[in-house]
Curated annotation (Swiss-Prot):
May act as a tumor suppressor in larval imaginal disks. It comes from Drosophila virilis (Fruit fly). Residues 441-529 are annotated as: Disordered. CXXCXGXG motif repeats lie at residues 243-250, 260-267, 282-289, 296-303. Residues 497-508 have a biased composition (Basic and acidic residues). Zn(2+) 1 binds at residues 243, 246, 296, 299. The modification N6-acetyllysine is found at residue 121. The modification Omega-N-methylarginine is found at residue 35. Signal peptide: none annotated. This is DnaJ homolog l(2)tid, mitochondrial. CDD domains: DnaJ, DnaJ_C, DnaJ_zf. The lineage of its organism: Eukaryota, Metazoa, Ecdysozoa, Arthropoda, Hexapoda.
Length: 529
């Protein structure tokens, strides 16, 4: 026989009140390799008193059984917030917010009145976003399957001897039920506005306290003149800055933080879950070793709040469309991207600008000056005689200011000759006279006949067209008036034909002393005499 005492020593079993005996036939090796699945002390005799050790042993076994069952059911019933939002566990904050943005619109009760489960789905999506959008809550959820706020609700006691552990006051695991601190409807209104889905609601949501809590980017609209000359513009942005009430101390004014009572000021805690022991950063002080008994009511003990501020953004002169500048706002950085409107007059090419300058036919032939609008001031442009259309004239240094370099760009002016569409009788007569004197005309001119000697003369119907360049399809009355006028002009042209020939012969004989212009002036004088 193996004594009960030796058997208990080998198996590390308690000796007190042990009355069990084992047969020597059983192999000692088998006894050492197979431990009884359940050991219970021999009950006391009827009417006998139960010892304190027996009571503690029975209670401990009961607690272990309850702990296994409840802890397993808690894990099985825990919600997978990543699956709720349809994102991966390594998804960044932008992907999480985008997923919530789409699902919130999809499952909102106002847009799914026929779906009885829409309200429940909308609540689940809001719960998942509230936890995963907060870095601290997400870290705690990934580690423990719940957050500190919910663990605090479970009461003191539990693993490691610290309150708020994964087990309740009796050492039993409790199933975590989410308790949102933000109304899902309020969160939805912050995103989409009141009563409608705005096109820019997602941008507003990013600047709200339910988004990232920080105005990281801002798009500013500018006119061309504002971008060219520079301007200071005031904008309202949401920034995360030091709490004005507690000045960043996280405590109510007049109070101070004390040593963390959960980690004893070490910043770490030890959590025991069955046979496993884990040492990690304290969940209550986050490694700061301090415990805030009276947290600030304004910032809820975070030391920072989302504040609406009016910020003056200095727009540099010459800024281009799509450029981004960085500026400091409190303790954070604000990135401002500029969106410059197109100008109806200026065409921009970097620091250079291009404009069109219309000039008359006389200015193009004889030369002159024209006033053009510049970027910063008007400029007088000199037109040389014989300037052709689409000629490009450069005004050096009159363009836009270079943002990242010294100096200015150039202003290029493109000449546009405006041909008159309506001519008076005198203007048409002058042009016909000039056409007769023109010698290098490519092709033919309407209303001009070619002589044998190479000269040109106006035909009978050359001047019959009205000064407003009326088309050929006229009414009967206008046609009759044009016919009578054409007959009169034909007789006048015949009477002047001999005079034209004589004038041309005199010009040729004089060797061009007065130039072709002399014959041209005589022609004009004869037409108006």
């Amino acid at each position: 026989m193996i004594s009960c005492k030796n058997l208990c020593v080998l198996r590390q079993l308690p000796l007190k009140n042990c009355r069990r005996h084992y047969s020597a036939i059983q192999s000692s090796a088998a006894l050492l390799s197979v431990r009884p699945t359940k050991w219970t002390p021999k009950p006391a005799a009827a009417g006998g008193a139960v010892s304190a050790w027996q009571q503690r042993t029975t209670a401990k076994q009961h607690q272990q059984q309850q702990r296994r069952s409840l802890f397993s059911s808690s894990r099985m019933q825990a919600k997978d917030y990543y699956a709720t939002l349809g994102v991966a566990k390594n998804a960044n904050a932008k992907d999480i917010k985008k997923a919530y943005y789409e699902l919130a619109k999809k499952y909102h009760p106002d847009t799914n009145k026929d779906d009885p489960d829409a309200s429940k789905k909308f609540q689940d999506v809001s719960e998942a976003y509230e936890v995963l959008s907060d870095d601290q809550k997400r870290r705690e959820y990934d580690t423990y399957g719940q957050t500190t706020e919910n663990m605090n609700r479970q009461g003191a006691g539990g693993a490691g001897g610290f309150g708020g552990g994964p087990f309740g006051p009796d050492g039993f695991s409790q199933n975590w039920q989410f308790r949102s601190t933000i109304d899902p409807e309020e969160l939805f209104r912050k995103i989409f506005g009141e009563g409608n889905f705005r096109s820019n609601s997602f941008d507003d949501f990013a600047d709200s306290k339910f988004g990232f809590g920080q105005a990281q980017e801002l798009v500013m609209d500018l006119t061309f003149a504002q971008a060219a000359r520079g301007v200071n513009k005031d904008v309202n942005v949401n920034v995360v800055d030091q709490c004005p009430k507690c000045a960043g101390s996280k405590c109510e004014p007049g109070t101070k933080p004390g040593r963390c009572q959960y980690c004893n000021g070490t910043g770490f805690e030890t959590i025991s879950t069955g046979p496993f022991v884990m040492r990690s950063t304290c969940r209550y002080c986050q490694g700061t070793r301090q415990y805030i008994k009276y947290p600030c009511a304004e910032c809820e003990g975070k030391g920072q709040t989302v504040q609406r501020r009016k910020v003056t953004v200095p727009v540099p002169a010459g800024i281009e469309n799509g450029q981004t500048v960085r500026m400091q706002v409190g303790s954070k950085e604000l990135f401002v991207t500029f969106r410059v409107e197109r100008s109806d007059y200026f065409r921009r090419d970097g620091a250079d600008v291009h404009t069109d300058a219309p000039i008359s036919l006389a200015q193009a032939v004889l030369g002159g000056t024209v006033r053009v609008q510049g970027v910063y001031e008007d400029q007088w442009l000199n037109i040389e005689p014989g300037t052709s259309s689409h000629r490009k004239i450069a005004l050096r240094g009159k363009g836009l200011k270079r943002v990242n370099a010294h100096g200015h760009g150039d202003h290029y002016v493109h000449i546009k000759i405006e041909v008159p569409k309506k001519l008076s009788q005198e203007q048409r007569a002058l042009l016909e006279a000039y056409a007769e004197l023109e010698e290098d005309t490519p092709g033919q001119i309407h209303g001009m006949a070619q002589r044998k000697d190479g000269s040109k003369k106006a035909t009978a119907g050359a001047s019959e067209t009205k000064t407003d360049a009326q088309p050929a399809g006229r009414t009967a009355d206008s046609g009759s008036q044009g016919t009578s006028r054409a007959g009169a002009e034909t007789e006048s042209a015949k009477g002047q034909q001999s005079e034209k020939s004589e004038t041309r012969r005199k010009d040729q004989q004089t060797g061009g002393e007065s130039g072709s212009g002399g014959g041209f002036l005589n022609k004009i004088k004869s037409m108006f005499n």
